[in-house]
Swiss-Prot record:
Pfam families: SurE. Signal peptide: none annotated. Nucleotidase that shows phosphatase activity on nucleoside 5'-monophosphates. This is 5'-nucleotidase SurE. Its main location: cytoplasm. Belongs to the SurE nucleotidase family. Its cofactor is a divalent metal cation. It is found in: Cytoplasm.
Amino acid sequence: MKILICNDDGYQASGIVALYEALKTIADVEVVAPEQNNSAKSNALTLHSPMYVQTAANGFRYINGTPADCVHIALTGLLGYRPDLVVSGINNGANMGDDTIYSGTVGAAMEGYLFGIPAIAFSQTEKGWTHIDVAAQQARNLIKQLIPSLEAVAEGAQPSVPPWLLNVNIPNLPAGQVEGFKVCRLGRRHAAERVIVQTSPRGESMYWIGGAGPAKEAGEGTDFHATTQGYVSITPLHVDLTDHERLPYWAQTAARLTHKH
């Protein structure tokens, strides 16, 4: 069983170290991660500047690129083999609801998914790495349950299935207080907080993106609700952004626009 690990917090982050330590006992694990923090980089790829692969003292390889860059380079030229699973995280903070659109953690996992490999993005719901070892153990528990079916596909004993992509958020709780796992949908957030404006020493205005908005749609069945109840939320994702419900309306609108005069 071969697993590729990436993240968006950088190769030295506590989350990726804890995840590696938890998974190396159940699989062959390779780490390829960004050199620096690349939060909120989504699926961005670096197209106009060169990237370099370096190896840290602990064997982790790191790249001066985005999370998606790291997975892309690993899968298309660095590893020399096809992993059975791509795992991203553990992120320093939640990736729930609208966060998934911006998240570099999700973006790294999605890059693996786009290459036809099952993938999971793991995040811890609060920043600061408190109880990160507990979060890593929860990630290990989930992956351990998936290994038999992944190995069966890899060995040809089970028919291959389309790749899947999971977004997993782990509550920041001590051992024994995590209630279990719950499959749920994405919630929604309110719009982000206002931009923060400061003045530089030269008198110029500087702008900082404000924090994520609070939960807006967080009722039962959402990832927000599950994690506040002490559960690890599991949300299956896909990349089809088509608004299927409104397709007929826009088809009618387009027909009116394109009829011959």
